[in-house]
Amino acid sequence: MGLTPSATKPEIAQAPQGIVDPSTGRPVGADDPFFKEINSELADKGFILTTADDLITWARTGSLMWMTFGLACCAVEMMQVSMPRYDVERFGFAPRASPRQSDVMIVAGTLTNKMAPALRKVYDQMPEPRYVISMGSCANGGGYYHFSYAVVRGCDRIVPVDIYVPGCPPTAEALLYGVLLLQKKIRRIGTIER
């Protein structure tokens, strides 16, 4: 068997594109003004000038530590987002077991009146700045059990919520999109209070 000229050419892998939006065919975040500004500055000067506030905000969005508060079936989908198919850690979003080491709390499931003080206590133990993602219909507004005497009609009555992820249960893709929205929100509003 001889080698043909086409067989001697090395195979070149395609460049990774990240998460591609199926409706546009472009990577998610390609239209983000934050990245456009950085790319234009790098192309123009070859280096980036920034402020300490912007640097801290950039570092914070790339190293968010989340704590689970899984209360019902949404917690199963929340676990899926850490598995290899979605691998949320590639976005700098890693799980932690302690609220004292967490920046983000994901409330997933039905919050009852009896569990509400525990939720608030865990939230108060988190260091500032802290963020909350409400995941699923039950956490957002009581869901299927909305009219029950024992259910809190939304975890936003107990803790301030930054991102709402709708669905019953929401898919892992929806939670991943919520994480990306939280990172975008942090970049937009910053984290340093004066």
From Swiss-Prot:
A GO biological process held by the record: aerobic respiration
Gene Ontology molecular function: any one: 4 iron, 4 sulfur cluster binding
Region Disordered, residue ranges: 1-26
Compartment(s): Cell inner membrane
Q: Which InterPro entries match?
A: NADH_UbQ_OxRdtase-like_20kDa, NADH_UQ_OxRdtase_20Kd_su
EC number of the protein: 7.1.1.-
Required co-factor(s) are: [4Fe-4S] cluster
Residue ranges annotated as coiled coil are none
Q: Which GO terms describe its cellular component?
A: plasma membrane; respiratory chain complex I
Q: What broad class describes the main subcellular location of this protein? A: membrane
Q: Which family does it belong to?
A: Belongs to the complex I 20 kDa subunit family.
Function of the protein: NDH-1 shuttles electrons from NADH, via FMN and iron-sulfur (Fe-S) centers, to quinones in the respiratory chain. The immediate electron acceptor for the enzyme in this species is believed to be ubiquinone. Couples the redox reaction to proton translocation (for every two electrons transferred, four hydrogen ions are translocated across the cytoplasmic membrane), and thus conserves the redox energy in a proton gradient.
Q: How does it assemble?
A: NDH-1 is composed of 14 different subunits. Subunits NuoB, C, D, E, F, and G constitute the peripheral sector of the complex.
- The identity of this protein, by name, is NADH-quinone oxidoreductase subunit B
Species per Swiss-Prot/TrEMBL record: Xanthobacter autotrophicus (strain ATCC BAA-1158 / Py2)
> What is the taxonomic lineage of the source species?
Bacteria, Pseudomonadati, Pseudomonadota, Alphaproteobacteria, Hyphomicrobiales
